[in-house]
């Protein structure tokens, strides 16, 4: 059951880093075209 805990921590760390970079830098890729 330790593998599940490591996977959860791994996903949480990557998620936090991804959102930190996404909110820190301006969105270069704009999905909504106005």
Curated annotation (Swiss-Prot):
Cellular component GO terms, alphabetical: photosystem II reaction center; plasma membrane-derived thylakoid membrane
GO biological process, one term: photosynthesis
Localization of this protein: Cellular thylakoid membrane
Transmembrane segments: 3-23
Record has Transmembrane as a keyword: yes
Predominant place of localization: membrane
Keyword vocabulary terms for this entry: Membrane, Photosynthesis, Photosystem II, Thylakoid, Transmembrane, Transmembrane helix
Membrane association type: Single-pass membrane protein
PANTHER family in UniProt: PHOTOSYSTEM II REACTION CENTER PROTEIN T, PTHR36411
Family statement: Belongs to the PsbT family.
Subunit text: PSII is composed of 1 copy each of membrane proteins PsbA, PsbB, PsbC, PsbD, PsbE, PsbF, PsbH, PsbI, PsbJ, PsbK, PsbL, PsbM, PsbT, PsbX, PsbY, PsbZ, Psb30/Ycf12, peripheral proteins PsbO, CyanoQ (PsbQ), PsbU, PsbV and a large number of cofactors. It forms dimeric complexes.
Functional note: Found at the monomer-monomer interface of the photosystem II (PS II) dimer, plays a role in assembly and dimerization of PSII. PSII is a light-driven water plastoquinone oxidoreductase, using light energy to abstract electrons from H(2)O, generating a proton gradient subsequently used for ATP formation.
HAMAP family xrefs: PSII_PsbT
Protein name stated in the entry: Photosystem II reaction center protein T
């Amino acid at each position: 059951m330790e593998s599940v805990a490591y996977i959860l921590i791994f996903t949480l760390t990557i998620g936090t880093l991804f959102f930190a970079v996404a909110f820190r830098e301006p969105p270069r890729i704009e999905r909504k075209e106005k």
